[in-house]
C-alpha cells in the first residue's frame, strides 16, 4: 500500500519559446538563455526522479506556438522517456498555446504519458503498486480560444480516495477566452486539489481545497522575474 501520494505540478513550459529583448546581449548568452526553458524542465524531471514521485502533472502550454519546433519536440519527448524509465506517470492537459488542433507532432509519447481529451472531462485512476491512490480529472483545449467554462463539467466520483482536477484556465474572469471560471466554480466540483495552468505567476488561490497555479518554471522576458519552478 502506498503510504503517501507524491506528485509534482508544473506547466507553461513554453519549450522553444523565443525570448524578447535579447539584442543587448552577445550571441553566446542569447544561446544560453534560449535553452533556459528546456533546462528548467530538465531540473523538474530530475527532481521527480530524486523525490521518487508517483506522477508529474503538466497543466498546458508545453510549447509556445502552433508549429512546435522539432528541437522542442525532441527535448520534451526525451525527458518524458526519462520519467518513463523511472516508472513515473505523466498526466497532461493541452492549453491555448498547444491545443489539439495545433498538434503536428509525430513523435510518439512513451506509454507512461496520458493526455486528456478535448470533448469531455475524463477520469483516470492513478495506480501505485496495484492500488488506486487517486483519481486525476482533466480536459484539454481543442482550439486556442476556449470560451466555455470547463470547470462546470468536473464532478468528483463517489468513492475517490483523493481527487485531482487539471485545467488550463483563467480564474476570476467570466469574459476570458481561456476557459474562464471563478474560484467558487472550482470549489463546487468536489476536488481535493486543483492543478491549474495559464497564469505564469505561482499562486495558491485556496487551501480548502487546494487551488494552485504553479506558474512557469522559467521567466520568458524581463517582466517575469523572481523565484520560479514547480510544486511538489
Tell me the role of every PLM-derived stretch.
Residues 1-73:
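N-terminal active-site segment of His-dependent metallophosphoesterases
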Residues 55, 66-212, 216-229:
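His/Asp/Glu-rich metal-coordinating catalytic cores
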Amino acid at each position: 500500500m502506498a503510504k503517501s501520494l507524491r506528485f509534482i505540478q508544473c506547466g507553461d513550459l513554453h519549450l522553444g519559446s523565443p525570448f524578447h529583448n535579447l539584442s543587448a546581449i552577445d550571441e553566446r548568452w542569447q544561446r544560453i538563455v534560449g535553452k533556459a526553458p528546456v533546462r528548467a524542465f530538465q531540473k523538474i524531471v530530475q527532481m521527480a526522479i530524486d523525490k521518487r514521485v508517483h506522477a508529474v502533472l503538466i497543466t498546458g502550454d508545453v510549447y509556445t506556438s502552433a508549429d512546435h519546433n522539432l528541437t522542442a519536440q525532441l527535448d520534451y519527448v526525451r525527458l518524458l522517456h526519462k520519467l518513463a524509465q523511472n516508472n513515473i506517470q505523466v498526466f497532461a492537459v493541452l492549453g491555448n498555446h498547444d491545443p489539439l488542433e495545433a498538434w503536428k507532432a509525430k513523435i510518439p509519447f512513451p506509454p507512461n504519458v496520458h493526455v486528456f481529451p478535448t470533448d469531455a472531462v475524463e477520469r483516470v485512476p492513478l495506480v501505485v503498486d496495484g492500488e488506486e491512490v487517486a483519481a486525476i480529472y482533466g480536459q484539454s483545449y481543442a482550439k486556442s480560444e476556449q470560451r466555455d467554462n470547463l470547470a462546470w463539467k468536473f464532478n468528483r466520483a463517489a468513492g475517490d480516495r483523493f481527487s485531482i482536477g487539471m485545467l488550463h484556465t483563467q480564474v476570476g474572469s467570466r469574459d476570458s477566452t481561456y476557459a474562464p471560471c471563478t474560484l467558487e466554480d472550482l470549489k463546487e466540483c468536489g476536488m481535493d486539489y486543483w492543478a491549474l495552468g495559464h497564469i505564469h505567476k505561482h499562486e495558491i488561490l485556496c487551501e480548502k481545497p487546494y487551488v494552485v497555479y504553479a506558474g512557469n518554471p522559467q521567466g520568458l522576458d524581463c517582466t517575469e522575474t523572481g523565484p520560479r519552478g514547480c510544486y511538489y
